[in-house]
A protein has these predicted regions:
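Phosphate/dinucleotide-binding and metal-coordinating scaffold of catalytic cores
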Residues: 1-111
Length: 111
């Protein structure tokens, strides 16, 4: 299953995070990289054209997911397994504390 989210920095589309059977991938948006206001979303993910890849969800993105009782409430309300980190990221991080937010990319089924 492929799942993706648009990553916004200060309401500007900064890039796309994707999960597939090979792991997790993040790539900055080409237009974002050309802007004078462009900043890396994390010190561990500096601005670059190359794709970042990881077998597990990047620690920066995992850190955006709530913890403790708030995570329990989110998991129960949206019926998301606590181990489904990408599902949690896409569901609860649309309005995070801080400059970064994640909006799910909805794939249209063209049959």
């Amino acid at each position: 299953m492929n799942r993706s989210g648009q990553v916004f920095y200060q309401n500007w589309l900064a890039g796309i995070i994707t999960e597939n059977e090979d792991g997790y991938f993040f790539q900055y948006d080409e237009n974002y990289l050309q802007q004078p206001y462009a900043q890396g979303i994390s010190l561990t993910m500096p601005l670059q054209n190359q794709v970042f890849s990881s077998p597990a969800l990047f620690p920066f993105f995992d850190g955006l997911i709530p913890e403790g009782w708030l995570l329990d409430i989110a998991s129960e309300n949206w019926k998301i397994n606590l181990r489904d980190r990408m599902g949690l990221l896409l569901t609860v991080c649309g309005d995070c504390i801080g400059a970064v937010s994640i909006k799910p990319v909805i794939e249209e089924n063209h049959e």
